[in-house]
């Protein structure tokens, strides 16, 4: 049976729900799919199907995340929802789900809570550019308490502005009532999606830059060859393109003989899309997760760089003790983790949990690196820091 061709007639946006535990993120995600399914723009996903999230790995960190897709009349959305707070932190620091914008869900009965604040801060640190607020559980507020909602809104706006998110639209509604089909609340979901359409700009896709895709997984398809999957970070890849495989081992060249997305064949894949690429003459053992596929000579692998790093505090799940020059944690770049040896700058004897520092790293295997790229630092199964490459040395 020939595969159906994927229709690309709308711009594609990656978004996600963020916010405090039990404020209604997953219920809202389900309510969005329900409201849009009535217009034939989504398949309805109920709460339990979103809540029973499969485990996935990003930079070697196990994350539970649910991905749903839906459309508005103008756009195609991929939406990520995480069940647990720790999953959000890991998802955002690792950039596992790069978000073009986020829907911050806040319960009108509670207002901003600790994780609300933490998620806003995280969004800022990892570069989520836009936020739209959904003030949930508005059906629980009595007439007498109506003005409390205005106070919650003011507090939220201040909190967001403090972190550089000015003028975020705030939509009031009830995800649960919308999910139950209450027409006035379903209308609020439509209003929310209109606000998302209007306030989260279609990102400048990195389509014009040289093609690059970090490999997430490798499959062997009998009779066809080796398929590598991942999210295209930038550029365009077409069937017939010459590409390089960079990182971990010696750089190799190959030809892309097929591109597919959601099990449908495409003539090309573009930045932001999750695709599978069929590679000519490459065996399953020639490629592995953590390498990148790119336009020839656009990226090189490196082993030495300077990083601007934030080391998590003990309370954030980080280390309890300082570390010194010679420290050897794991460094996570895109889809790979490599041990690296840390050299602290002159005059810095040690780094304490909670410190911001710039230090040098010598990796034990070559990785495709670029300045401005993000990474996570892990040790003994937990994230102890996150950073950005400030300078490549070798």
From Swiss-Prot:
Residue sites binding Mg(2+) per the record: 26
- Residue ranges of region G4? 136-139
Stretch list, region G2: 60-64
| Chain positions covered by the region annotation G1 | 19-26
For this UniProt entry, the molecular function terms from Gene Ontology, in alphabetical order, are: GTP binding; GTPase activity; translation elongation factor activity
- Positions of region (G3): 81-84
What's this protein's family per the entry?
Belongs to the TRAFAC class translation factor GTPase superfamily. Classic translation factor GTPase family. EF-Tu/EF-1A subfamily.
Matches recorded under HAMAP family: EF_Tu_B (MF_00118_B)
Q: What is this protein called?
A: Elongation factor Tu
């Amino acid at each position: 049976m020939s595969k159906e061709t994927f229709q690309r007639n709308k711009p594609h946006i990656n978004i996600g729900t963020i916010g405090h535990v039990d404020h209604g993120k997953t219920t809202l995600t389900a309510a969005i799919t329900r409201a849009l399914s009535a217009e034939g723009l989504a398949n309805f996903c109920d709460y339990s199907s979103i809540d029973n999230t499969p485990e996935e790995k990003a930079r070697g960190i196990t994350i539970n995340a649910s991905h749903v897709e839906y459309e508005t009349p103008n756009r195609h959305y991929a939406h990520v929802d995480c069940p647990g707070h720790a999953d959000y932190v890991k998802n955002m620091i690792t950039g596992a789900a790069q978000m073009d914008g986020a829907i911050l869900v806040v319960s009108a009965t509670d207002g901003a809570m600790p994780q609300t604040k933490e998620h806003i801060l995280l969004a800022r640190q990892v570069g989520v550019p836009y936020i739209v607020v959904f003030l949930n559980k508005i059906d629980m507020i009595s007439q007498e308490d109506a003005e409390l909602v205005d106070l919650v809104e003011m507090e939220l706006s201040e909190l967001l502005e403090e972190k550089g998110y000015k003028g975020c639209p705030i939509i009031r509604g009830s995800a649960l009532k919308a999910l139950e089909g209450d027409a006035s609340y379903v209308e609020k979901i439509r209003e929310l999606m209109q606000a998302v359409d209007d306030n989260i700009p279609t990102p400048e896709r990195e389509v014009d830059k040289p093609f690059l895709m970090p490999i997430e997984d490798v499959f062997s398809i009998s009779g066809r060859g080796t398929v590598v999957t991942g999210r295209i970070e930038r550029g365009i890849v077409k069937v017939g393109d010459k590409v390089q495989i960079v990182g971990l081992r010696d750089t190799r060249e190959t030809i892309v003989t097929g591109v597919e997305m959601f099990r449908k064949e495409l003539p090309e894949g573009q930045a932001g899309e999750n695709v599978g690429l069929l590679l000519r003459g490459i065996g399953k053992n020639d490629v592995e997760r953590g390498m990148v596929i790119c336009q020839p000579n656009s990226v090189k692998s490196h082993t030495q760089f300077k990083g601007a790093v934030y080391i998590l505090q003990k309370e954030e799940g980080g280390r309890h003790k300082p570390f010194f020059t010679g420290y050897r944690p794991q460094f996570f770049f895109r889809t790979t983790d490599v041990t690296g040896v840390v050299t602290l700058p002159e005059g810095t004897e040690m780094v304490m949990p909670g410190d911001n520092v710039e230090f040098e790293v010598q990796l034990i295997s070559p990785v495709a690196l670029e300045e401005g790229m993000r990474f996570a630092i892990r040790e003994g199964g937990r994230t102890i820091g996150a950073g950005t490459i400030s300078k490549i040395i070798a």
